[in-house]
Design a protein with these regions (language model features):
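Short amphipathic alpha-helical segments
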Residues: 13-17, 37-39, 176-177
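Helix N-cap/beta->alpha junction signal
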Residues: 5-6, 103
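Catalytic core of DAGKc-family lipid kinases
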Residues: 19-23, 27-161
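Glycine-rich phosphate/pyrophosphate-binding beta-alpha loops
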Residues: 103, 107, 164-180, 248
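Short Gly/Thr/Asp-enriched flexible loops that form oxyanion-binding sites at enzyme active sites
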Residues: 1, 9-22
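ATP/nucleoside-binding phosphotransfer catalytic cores, i.e., glycine-rich phosphate-binding loops
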Residues: 146-157, 176-188, 192-254
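Hydrophobic structural packing positions in well-ordered secondary structure
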Residues: 7-10, 28, 110, 163, ...
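Hydrophobic/aromatic beta-strand patches that form the interior of the parallel beta-sheet core
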Residues: 2, 25-27, 191
């Protein structure tokens, strides 16, 4: 299967092949192309990408990569992946793969705003959404139960504007939110903000994100996890709609 497009099209391809073992070729011509960028695939170079795919088919070669799988817990439900509306009155369960990141907070709000922006596709649209959303951040309430990389289990509340479960390093056309993520390590990276940052911290975080040094900021927390449950905490604001790979996913708990 060959997916031609941006992050959303790659997400469709990833869900089509799932864990079937079928190879997925990517011709990255979208606005973000974060998954392709993370794999060092050609970006916005159609002929080069097609030649690479044909060569891989002829040689019978491929690389194995991890995907995240998000499923709903009781009371969690899916929404339409294209516009964020409820799928049906029956509240369908969430059951989908994602290649890049599951966005649960500020990152999801930024993605939603970028999706509805009238600016041209690309990094400018996402950067503008970042600036707008940073001006009215909320501290959302999450309760997490995570199996960490060493097999231990951690359970706690996180009251934070941002919570991301990352499989890849980049989001939004090159912003490196999770610099330690690797595509074939069997792990996900949980990244969050420890508190609502002030203006100076926001400027510092944005600058660091565009230069691959985000987790050097004291405002961020980070854990490597094998799996995680995310529910609504009793404190904090209501989290926004979850998004993954630029597509709408659904509502907590997952």
């Amino acid at each position: 299967l060959v997916a031609v497009g941006g992050v959303g099209m790659v997400a469709l391809g990833a869900n089509a092949v799932g864990c079937s073992g079928k190879p997925l070729g990517i011709v990255a011509i979208g606005s973000g192309n974060d998954f392709a960028r993370g794999l060092d695939l050609p970006v916005n170079r159609v002929e080069t990408a097609v030649e690479g795919i044909v060569g891989a088919i002829v040689r019978g070669t491929h690389i194995d990569v991890d995907m995240g799988l998000v499923t709903s817990l009781p009371d969690g439900h899916a929404i339409d992946s294209t516009d964020g509306t409820d799928v049906s009155q029956s509240r369908s369960p969430i059951d989908r793969y994602y290649a890049g990141m599951l966005s649960c907070g500020l990152d999801a709000s930024i993605n939603d705003r970028a999706n509805h922006s009238h600016l041209p596709n690309g990094s400018l649209r996402y950067f503008a959404a970042v600036i707008v959303e940073l001006t009215h951040m909320k501290s959302c309430g999450y309760h997490i139960k995570a199996t960490l990389a060493d097999g231990s289990v951690e359970e706690r509340d996180i009251i934070s504007p941002l919570l991301t479960v990352a499989n890849s390093r980049h989001i939004g056309g090159g912003i490196e939110v999770s610099p330690y993520s690797r595509f074939a390590d069997g792990l996900l990276d949980l990244v969050w903000l420890d508190h609502v940052p002030n203006f100076r911290e926001c400027v510092d975080a944005v600058a660091r994100a565009y230069h691959g040094r985000l987790l050097g900021s004291h405002a961020f927390g980070w854990k490597r996890v094998r799996d995680i449950e995310i529910t609504r905490a009793t404190e904090g604001d209501e989290p926004p709609v979850l998004m993954a790979d630029g597509e709408y996913v659904g509502h907590l708990p997952v």
